[in-house]
């Protein structure tokens, strides 16, 4: 009888991936770094929307801030569901894509707010 430690379960090699709902230390660090940087960028963008270029803020700046806030709420809901175990692990790529889109939207908004390129 073969040893339990050497079973490959149909994969090309030993399968040491975490089970559903478990995360490795590397994944937790990546999630913390991505989440922290994204949160900081969103905060800077929302503050910039209301402060720059002068007070009172332009309506387009407020529109940018609302769009970024709504996108962020959507991402937070997906992250909450993922952490609860309601979503399959394949949705992690979707969450990363949404976060990347939010980061790009924040960069575009900040470039617009600060009149870069004019």
From Swiss-Prot:
Keywords carried by this UniProt record: Acetylation, Membrane, Transmembrane, Transmembrane helix
The organism's place on the tree of life at top rank: Eukaryota
Pfam families: DUF2678
Cell compartments where the protein resides: Membrane
Principal subcellular localisation of the protein: membrane
Entry-annotated residues carrying N-acetylmethionine: 1
InterPro entries: DUF2678
UniProt name for this protein: Transmembrane protein 243
Organism of this sequence: Homo sapiens
Lineage: Eukaryota, Metazoa, Chordata, Craniata, Vertebrata
């Amino acid at each position: 009888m073969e040893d339990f430690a050497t079973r490959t379960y149909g994969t090309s090699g030993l399968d040491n991936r975490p089970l559903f709902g478990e995360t490795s230390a590397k994944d937790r660090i990546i999630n913390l770094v991505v989440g922290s940087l994204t949160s900081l960028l969103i905060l800077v963008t929302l503050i910039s929307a209301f402060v720059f270029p002068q007070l009172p803020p332009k309506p387009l700046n407020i529109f940018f801030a609302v769009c970024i806030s709504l996108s962020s709420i959507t991402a937070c809901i997906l992250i909450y569901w993922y952490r609860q175990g309601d979503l399959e692990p394949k949705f992690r790529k979707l969450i990363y894509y949404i976060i990347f889109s939010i980061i790009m939207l924040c960069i575009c908004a900040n470039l617009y707010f600060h009149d870069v390129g004019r």
